[in-house]
């Protein structure tokens, strides 16, 4: 059964396809010659040393950063791909007194025409998304008053409110304690399992990825190249040592 499932997705057009892509800033490339396909149902983790370009790749998948050279194709047909993007928590401005519900509601803004009210259906969707991440009872609480793990779950709910084809998460385990990190990993795994949500996450928490065993494939960003394979193989201690000259225990 697993082989049939794999063959079906191998034959399908990729949702995202990098074709000899160069990425960089101010016209200066930091990554070149990238080839990467993401199919519906994939669950990938982008890993590598600090500054290797993991977040740059994630932003380019979402269309936030366009390539300097090459082509990134988004969508397997005429219908555009919808993204749910979870940035690093440090990028969220904390001075505005927004509630949990109001932050999650931002995920619907891409579907709302300027000057039009948010529909009842979208508000109900946001309530469902907050329930999915276990925060329905906190929807009226100020966002800055939450713990780090709770804030991260709100940002995931906001991404889900975009009704995405692909969920993109940039360091979702960063800056939270071990218990909260386990909760976040279990949540991401459940969303992928229950909804078939294509998921790509950036993480430097290699030990957590290996121990939780929820990511299907890992893509190492190493010396400007991409190396992709099954999670069990790519997170094995000998592979980690080769890629980072470090042991994860």
Where are these regions (language model features)?
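Helix-to-loop junction immediately C-terminal to a conserved catalytic motif
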Residues: 62
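Catalytic Walker B motif of ABC-type/P-loop ATPase nucleotide-binding domains
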Residues: 167-171
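Conserved catalytic motifs of ABC-family nucleotide-binding domains
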Residues: 163
């Amino acid at each position: 059964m697993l082989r049939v499932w794999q063959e079906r997705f191998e034959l399908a057009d990729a949702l995202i396809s990098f074709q000899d892509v160069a990425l960089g800033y101010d016209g200066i490339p930091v990554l070149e010659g990238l080839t990467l396909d993401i199919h519906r149902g994939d669950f990938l983790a982008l890993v590598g040393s600090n500054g290797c370009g993991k977040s740059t790749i994630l932003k380019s998948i979402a269309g936030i950063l366009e390539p300097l050279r090459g082509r990134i194709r988004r969508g397997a047909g005429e219908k555009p791909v919808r993204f749910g993007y979870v940035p690093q928590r440090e990028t969220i401005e904390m001075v505005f007194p927004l509630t949990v519900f109001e932050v999650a509601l931002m995920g619907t803004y891409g579907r709302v025409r300027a000057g039009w009210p948010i529909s009842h259906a979208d508000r109900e969707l946001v309530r469902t998304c907050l329930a999915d991440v276990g925060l329905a009872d906190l929807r009226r609480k100020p966002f800055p008053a939450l713990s780090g793990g709770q804030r991260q779950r709100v940002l995931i709910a906001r991404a889900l409110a975009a009704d995405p084809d692909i969920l993109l998460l940039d360091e979702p385990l960063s800056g939270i304690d071990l218990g909260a990190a386990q909760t976040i990993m279990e949540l991401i795994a459940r969303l992928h399992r229950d909804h078939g949500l294509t998921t790509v996450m950036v993480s430097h928490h290699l030990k957590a990825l290996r121990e939780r065993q929820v990511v299907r494939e890992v893509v190492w960003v190493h010396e400007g190249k991409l190396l992709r394979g099954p999670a069990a193989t790519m997170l094995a201690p000998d592979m980690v040592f080769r890629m980072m000259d470090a042991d994860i225990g």
